[in-house]
């Protein structure tokens, strides 16, 4: 006779899908102990257990392997269960708990086998525990308590020899039938409408885990438990009683606020669990009923806390009225419109009341145990002991996403915010702090503790002049075809400065310097400074229109030009810098208007959001402080030689032009054009014994290729390489160490507005091996770094916020842009009288006291309804082994915004395959373009505007950008002919 089988309910189906995804694990195990204290008759207890098993069909369900992926249920006949007694009376409690945890982690045999297991544990003479383990497909947490109460009731009746109930308990089969009817009912249609309207535009899923490593997500989990202080527990209970709110509403509201701040998102969903037992019979029934459902809340920072708690409570009640609707059907409904929909629930919270109950001659309670797995990245259980008043929080967390330290921080954030909210329940949410005083102290002061800087001179040229007086005959600069000593360079600059002073250059005068990399360039810069003025660097490679704009906008009346360079349409005076003429001049007494530390030193133009570049005005004291701090952190010696290879229109040139002069070291001026050719750079390093160089990350990869070819590590003079201008990819950093093991790699970060670099990070191959992002490090001496929220409140460690820079390096402001200066240069809220610079960069502190750069705040885009940070995709791309460099942009060539990824070093199909393992599908770029050479701006940064559009050759083959004017013209001609996207070389 064939066996009758039944379909899984939707609640059971969710469990089964979890089992399929995590097969061979204990993720679906439900383990508990009913703990008895008193004189317990073990034979009677065994009889009570068996009577309960016989009367509840849900326990006796087994699984039959189906033809499809989904199994069928069938009901087995009752068989008496003899309890094995394990004696733990002479064993420490920690060993007992360990044994239980080990049992909890043993998975069940799934098919044609009992899905329950029982033992009796003798703890001591007056305490015994009934150990029970079930597969979640036949039992939920409420059922455990129901069964525990049944066993107690049966035990007492058997002890008193009272008649036992002869009717079976309500059957789970009736629930299976009832759910089938519900799915065809008008109630189901109403519930479906509620849920689909609530999540019509679902909130973006943002992980609470601030991943810094390449670990892949796994359901393997750990638990950390905290017990609230008696005072806090009592305060919570009194508050909830007075305000007539539930503890779960209070905790969930507080948790919403924490998550909102950690993820920088207001629209959030947190999962919680509902019994899903509508009738009296269902409340007494054993089986799997529980619904896991998302509660969606918008955390408005301008709402007051108490009102927000009440709103959370109303949402909980609203969800409760529609709890029967299966969660898996909700996700399926939403995926009809959004195929890329991520899981709605990543974080969950639930409330569990616990207590010891009194019975005739004994006490008892039911305790649940952790399986070692969790389907959510973080699950929080609030356990309140109603007998003692103790409140305990269990944090179950996926340990590939979180460390214990991460969880401790989240706990501290939650409790700090909760305590502040209880003291000030009518405060606006934005006013409630979740960073305690100790953490604030660490973030503001300890992490920003640097060595004090005491410059040897107040001005840039003063530093040089001081060294020229000490080591006049030492070589200051070397270049193709010659060199100049400190005394000679000082002489040339001084003689030119006389001409400048005669033309009215004085303090605050801005003088343009138009020159390729050459001794004339440095002579002109020093001459302007000596005369008291400020230099405006002008790279001849810049478009003429841009040069004209900068000269006009800066108000420069005088232009110093290298022979052969000119600026069309410049209405002021142009003075050619001719070394031969200067050498033949007679020495004159230098009579200049001396600059001081507060005088303007230089103006460097950076890209502006309006399309017009903006001039950043930097004073001597800011530049001198930065250079002094740099020398303190990375001391140069007299035998050091710094390679000057960056365009002096880019702020990284400042340390290349001046740093070496603090110690009597030398600079080597790389011939113009050589900076684009790694072979020539390596040649210069060999021939000139270069010790210090700077690269943007894209060029660093090409340099490493050449270093590998030429075995540069064999006896190289290099001591240190700085990488900056763009985020440094972990793969690039990983390549560096084996190729140049004796050379330090230093990741630098800093906007022009903070005087070159505000932070440095010295890489360590072992420590940084598994990082997802290379940190930008700690502040340079004299600087401070703050990570703040939109209200200038301190963001906790690990939480993203906007990066602000404070300290001695903060520039004067934007030239002739008072409104923009006021917008970006603010009062320092922590050091009265000082200023901070608002970078517009997203960053966070990581536990070891370093800053991690996360991207630009204004780079976020919305693609197909999802808000996406291209920098996050870039970080994932750079983490793929074999990818040397990556960039992600948003293109609208097709009429709709699409993500386009550019990569170097790995075939795009392989990149896509690897990326799909790291990111959800909605973050996978629509286009992948392979690059061999990257277009860069004259300042050496990646020129994102020059990246090729998708389609045609660029999207089909490895793309090499045009490298010079001739190639650009040829490429343009072919593009006009082919009409098929960009043409590479």
Regions found by a protein language model. Give the residues of each.
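AMP-dependent adenylate-forming
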Residues: 326, 340, 358, 388, ...
């Amino acid at each position: 006779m064939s066996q009758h089988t039944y379909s899984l309910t939707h609640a059971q189906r969710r469990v089964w899908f979890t089992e399929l995804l995590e097969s061979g694990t204990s993720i679906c195990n439900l383990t508990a102990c009913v703990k008895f204290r008193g004189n317990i008759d073990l034979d009677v207890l065994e009889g009570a257990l068996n009577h309960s098993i016989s009367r509840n069909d849900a326990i006796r369900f087994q699984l039959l392997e189906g033809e499809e992926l989904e199994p069928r249920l069938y009901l087995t006949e009752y068989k008496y269960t003899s309890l094995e007694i394990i004696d733990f009376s002479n064993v420490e409690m920690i060993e007992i708990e360990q044994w239980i945890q080990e049992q909890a982690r043993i998975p069940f045999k799934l098919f044609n086998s009992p899905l329950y297991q029982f033992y009796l544990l003798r703890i001591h003479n007056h305490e015994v525990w009934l150990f029970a383990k079930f597969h979640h497909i036949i039992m939920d947490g409420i059922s455990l308590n129901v069964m525990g109460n049944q066993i107690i009731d049966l035990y007492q009746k058997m002890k008193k020899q009272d008649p036992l109930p002869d009717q079976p308990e309500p059957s789970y089969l009736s629930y299976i039938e009832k759910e089938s009817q519900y799915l065809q009912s008008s109630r189901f249609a109403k519930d479906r409408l509620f849920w689909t309207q609530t999540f019509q535009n679902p909130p973006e899923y943002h992980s609470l885990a601030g991943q810094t490593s390449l670990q892949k997500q796994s359901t393997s989990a750990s638990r950390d438990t905290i017990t609230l202080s008696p005072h806090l527990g009592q305060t919570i209970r009194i508050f909830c009683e007075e305000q007539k709110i539930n503890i779960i509403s209070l905790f969930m509201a507080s948790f919403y606020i924490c998550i909102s701040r950690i993820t920088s998102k207001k629209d959030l969903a947190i999962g919680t669990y509902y019994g899903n037992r509508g009738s009296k019979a269902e409340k007494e029934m054993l089986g799997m009923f529980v619904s896991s459902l998302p509660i969606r809340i918008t955390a408005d920072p301008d709402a007051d806390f108490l009102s927000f708690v009440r709103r959370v409570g109303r949402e909980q009640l609203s969800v409760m009225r529609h709890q029967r609707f299966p969660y898996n059907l909700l996700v399926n409904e939403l995926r009809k419109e959004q195929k890329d929909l991520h899981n709605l629930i990543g974080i969950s919270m639930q409330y569990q009341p616990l207590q010891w109950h009194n019975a005739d001659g004994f006490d008892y309670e039911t305790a649940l145990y952790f399986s070692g797995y969790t389907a959510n990245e973080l699950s929080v259980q609030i356990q309140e002991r109603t007998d003692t008043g103790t409140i305990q929080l269990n944090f179950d967390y996926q340990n590939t996403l979180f460390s214990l330290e991460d969880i401790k921080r989240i706990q501290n954030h939650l409790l700090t915010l909760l305590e502040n909210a209880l003291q000030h329940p009518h405060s606006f949410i934005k006013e409630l702090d979740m960073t305690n005083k100790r953490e604030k102290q660490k973030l503001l002061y300890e992490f920003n503790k640097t060595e004090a800087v005491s410059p040897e001179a107040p001005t840039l040229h003063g530093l040089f002049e001081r060294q020229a007086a000490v080591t006049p005959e030492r070589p200051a600069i070397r270049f193709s075809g010659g060199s100049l000593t400190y005394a000679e360079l000082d002489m040339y600059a001084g003689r030119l400065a006389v001409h400048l002073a005669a033309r009215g250059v004085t303090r605050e005068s801005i003088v343009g310097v138009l020159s390729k990399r050459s001794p004339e360039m440095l002579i002109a810069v020093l001459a302007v400074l000596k005369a008291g003025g400020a230099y405006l660097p002008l790279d001849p490679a810049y478009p003429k229109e841009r040069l004209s704009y900068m000269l006009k906008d800066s108000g420069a009346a005088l232009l110093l030009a290298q022979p052969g360079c000119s600026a069309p349409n410049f209405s002021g005076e142009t003075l050619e810098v001719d070394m031969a003429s200067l050498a033949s001049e007679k020495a004159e007494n230098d009579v200049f208007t001396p600059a001081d530390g507060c005088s303007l030193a230089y103006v460097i133009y950076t890209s502006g959001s309006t399309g017009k570049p903006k001039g950043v005005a930097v004073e001597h004291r800011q530049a001198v402080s930065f250079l002094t701090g740099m020398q303190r952190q990375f001391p140069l010696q007299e035998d050091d030689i710094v390679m000057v290879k960056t365009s002096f229109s880019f702020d990284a040139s400042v340390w290349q032009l001046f740093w070496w002069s603090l110690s009597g070291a030398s600079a080597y001026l790389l011939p113009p054009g050589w900076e684009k050719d790694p072979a020539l750079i390596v040649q210069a390093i060999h021939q000139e014994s270069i010790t210090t160089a700077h690269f943007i990350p894209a060029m660093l990869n090409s340099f490493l290729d050449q270093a590998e070819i030429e075995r540069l590590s064999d006896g190289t003079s290099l001591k240190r390489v700085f990488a900056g201008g763009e985020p440094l990819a972990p793969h690039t950093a990983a390549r560096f160490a084996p190729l140049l093991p004796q050379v330090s790699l230093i990741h630098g970060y800093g906007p022009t507005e903070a005087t070159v670099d505000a932070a440095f990070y010295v890489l360590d191959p072992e420590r940084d091996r598994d990082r997802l992002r290379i940190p930008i490090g700690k502040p340079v001496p004299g600087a401070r770094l703050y990570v703040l929220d939109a209200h200038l409140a301190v963001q906790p460690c690990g939480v993203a916020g906007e990066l602000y820079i404070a300290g001695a390096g903060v520039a004067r402001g934007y030239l002739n842009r008072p409104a923009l200066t006021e917008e970006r240069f603010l009062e320092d809220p922590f050091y009265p009288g000082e200023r901070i610079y608002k970078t517009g960069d997203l960053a966070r502190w990581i536990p070891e006291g370093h800053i991690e750069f996360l991207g630009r705040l204004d780079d976020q885009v919305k693609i197909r309804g999802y808000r996406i940070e291209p920098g996050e995709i870039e970080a994932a791309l750079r983490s793929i082994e074999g990818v040397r460099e990556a960039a992600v942009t948003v293109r609208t060539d097709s009429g709709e915004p699409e993500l386009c990824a550019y990569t170097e070093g790995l075939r795009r199909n392989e990149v896509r395959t690897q990326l799909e393992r790291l990111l959800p599908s909605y973050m996978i770029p629509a286009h992948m373009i392979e690059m061999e050479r990257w277009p860069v701006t004259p300042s050496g940064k990646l020129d994102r505007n020059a990246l090729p559009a998708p389609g045609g050759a660029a999207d089909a083959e490895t793309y090499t950008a045009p490298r010079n004017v001739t190639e650009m013209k040829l490429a343009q001609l072919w593009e006009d002919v082919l009409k098929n996207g960009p043409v590479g070389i």
